[in-house]
C-alpha cells in the first residue's frame, strides 16, 4: 500500500476522531509478589482495562499467567480483563477464561486454530474478541474478520516479553489498520514499548488504546496515577495537534 495514502487516511481519521483514549496497564511488568495489590492500584490510578498476557512457553519462549491466576485477581477490580492468548491449543482455554472472569480474548492469527470458529466460540461465551498483529503479520490479514471483532492489537515489539524497545517501523501498519477499520466500532491498540513519546506517535497513526507495562509499573516515581495520566495526555494532545484537513 502507498504509505502516502495511509498517511492521508490517518489524517482523515484523526480529524474526526471521537473514540476515547484508553490506557490499559499490562501486569506482565508488575510486581509478581503482590499482583492483587498491583491490579487494584492500576484500577484506582485510572487504568481503563487490565491486560493479561497468557504465555505457555510453546508459542513464545516465556511463561506467564493462566486462568487460575486471573480468577484470583478478579476480586481486586471491576475493570475488564483482556487476555492476550499466547497458548496452544487456543480453543481449549475459552471455558476456563470465561470462568475466571475474563471479558475479552485477543487472538493470534497463526496459532493453528480456525479463527472464525474461535471468534464464534468466544462470542458464544459472552466475551468480546480481538485480533493481534505481530510485526510479521500484514494489516490485510484482519480483513476477513473485521465485522466480527472489537479490537485490533498491533504489537509494537516482538511478543512474549516485556520491557522491549518500541518498533517505530510498525507505525505505517497502525495507519493502514485504521484505514481498514474505517467507521466500524473497533478499537485500535498498540502493545509494547509504550511511553509518552511513542504514545504520541501511535496516536497520530490512529491508535486509541495503549497497552503499557513498564512505563506504568516501573515508572521512576512509582506513582501509577501520574504515569497513566501522562500517557493519556500525551496521546490526547497528539491527536489534537494533528492536521485538520485531508
Annotated model-derived regions:
Residues 11-13:
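Short, positively charged and aromatic/hydrophobic N-terminal segments
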Residues 22-26, 50-52, 81-85, 105-107, ...:
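Hydrophobic faces of well-ordered beta-strands that scaffold small-molecule active sites
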Residues 31-34, 92-96, 102-187:
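Conserved anion-binding
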Residues 35, 53, 97, 152, ...:
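Conserved, mostly hydrophobic/aromatic
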Residues 49-67, 157-163, 216-220:
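Glycine-rich, proline-tolerant flexible connector loops at the mouths of alpha/beta enzymes
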Residues 52-121:
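N-terminal active-site wall of soluble small-molecule enzyme domains
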Residues 107-113, 153-163, 205-227:
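Glycine-rich phosphate-binding active-site loops on the catalytic face of alpha/beta enzymes
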Residues 217-244:
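C-terminal helical cap(s) of enzyme catalytic domains, especially alpha/beta-barrels
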